[in-house]
Swiss-Prot record:
It is found in: Secreted. Keywords: Disulfide bond, Neurotoxin, Secreted, Signal, Toxin. Residues 1-23 form the signal peptide. GO terms for molecular function: toxin activity. The cysteine framework is VIII (C-C-C-C-C-C-C-C-C-C). Its main location: secreted. Residues 24-32 form a propeptide. Expressed by the venom duct. It comes from Gemmula speciosa. This is Turripeptide VIII-01. Contains 4 disulfide bonds.
């Protein structure tokens, strides 16, 4: 009886979380069927998931396609490991940053947009901006 009550409570809590516009996940097993029908599609260069500073859970902000939420289990989509992800393959989609004084990532409200890729980032964002800690030393970074 206690086990079935735990299952019922878990289902209820998951349903409540997933009815918000963005949702938090503790692992990489994301399925587009978990999302509400009105969950937004990602915009150009928008980060699809970013780790919450409060909980360390990934907060998913948008879906990459009708069938894909956000490829958080693939390092080739990681802007910053275990912290930020983009729908596209990082190395083939983003140019390397060339100046550490220009923001690599800009955030407004709850939308993170990446302009270029760095080797390492000054994370978390300060004042809505993330700068490179070190510039990309090679054209294609291998994970």
């Amino acid at each position: 009886m206690a086990l079935s009550l735990d299952i019922l409570m878990s289902v209820t809590m998951v349903t409540a979380v997933l009815t918000t516009v963005n949702a938090e996940y503790k692992d990489s097993r994301l399925d587009s069927r978990q999302l509400p029908a009105n969950f937004p599609m990602c915009q150009h260069r928008q980060l699809c998931a970013v780790a919450s500073r409060a909980t360390n859970n990934l907060r998913v902000y948008c879906r990459c396609s009708d069938d894909t939420i956000c490829p958080i289990s693939d390092d080739h989509h990681a802007i910053y490991p275990n912290t930020a992800y983009i729908c596209q393959h990082v190395n083939s989609y983003l140019d390397p940053c060339v100046d550490i004084t220009i923001p690599a990532i800009v955030t407004t409200s709850e939308i993170y947009v990446i302009n270029c890729r760095c080797d390492t980032y000054q994370w978390p964002p300060v004042g809505g901006k993330v700068y490179c800690e070190s510039l990309s030393s090679r054209m294609f970074k291998l994970f």
